């Protein structure tokens, strides 16, 4: 990550065992054990990049990492197939005027079928917006619940319960 803020979580792919947590920027914990000057402490404490923040314990919007989840829900509910395509062009789309000025945008137009495979390859926001509408609210929420969203999980550190909405409902 060089000079950027971020975090990594490394887990065993078969067991889910937590192998490593890294938050950057970081600090040298030995400085605390060996004692540090007030100047050093202030430089860590006052750093706008927050090196003492455990970023892996914070809540973040999932962004494009949620696209495979959406695809999996579509496939397991039989709302989507790998062959289903949507028809649209350009980099901006909205369902209808009920969305007001809100548009779904995707970064890069691409040629080829607007299907699940290409949508994952090109991280196509428009495809996944349309797919979610096709899946439907009830199927989508039930699919998330089957994946344990909204449940507390056993974890060696205290973490927030996963959520798919800031309220009790999605529109």
Q: Which positions does each model-derived feature cover?
A:
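Short loop/turn motifs at secondary-structure junctions and domain boundaries
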Residues: 1-4
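Beta-lactam-recognizing serine transpeptidase/beta-lactamase-like catalytic domain environment
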Residues: 6, 12-64, 69-171
């Amino acid at each position: 990550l060089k000079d950027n803020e971020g975090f990594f979580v490394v887990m065993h792919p078969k067991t889910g065992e937590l192998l490593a947590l890294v938050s950057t920027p970081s600090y040298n914990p030995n400085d605390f054990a060996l004692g540090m000057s007030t100047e050093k402490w202030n430089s860590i404490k006052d750093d706008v990049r927050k090196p003492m923040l455990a970023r892996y314990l914070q809540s973040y919007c999932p962004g494009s990492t949620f696209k495979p989840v959406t695809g999996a829900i579509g496939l397991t509910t039989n709302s989507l197939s790998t062959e289903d395509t949507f028809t649209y062009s350009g980099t901006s789309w909205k369902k209808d005027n009920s969305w007001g000025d809100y548009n779904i945008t995707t970064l890069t137009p691409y040629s080829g079928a607007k299907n699940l495979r290409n949508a994952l390859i090109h991280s196509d926001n428009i495809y996944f917006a349309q797919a979610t509408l096709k899946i439907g609210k009830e199927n989508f929420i039930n699919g998330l619940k089957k994946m344990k969203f909204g449940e507390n999980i056993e974890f060696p550190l205290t973490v927030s319960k996963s959520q798919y909405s800031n309220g009790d409902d999605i529109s």
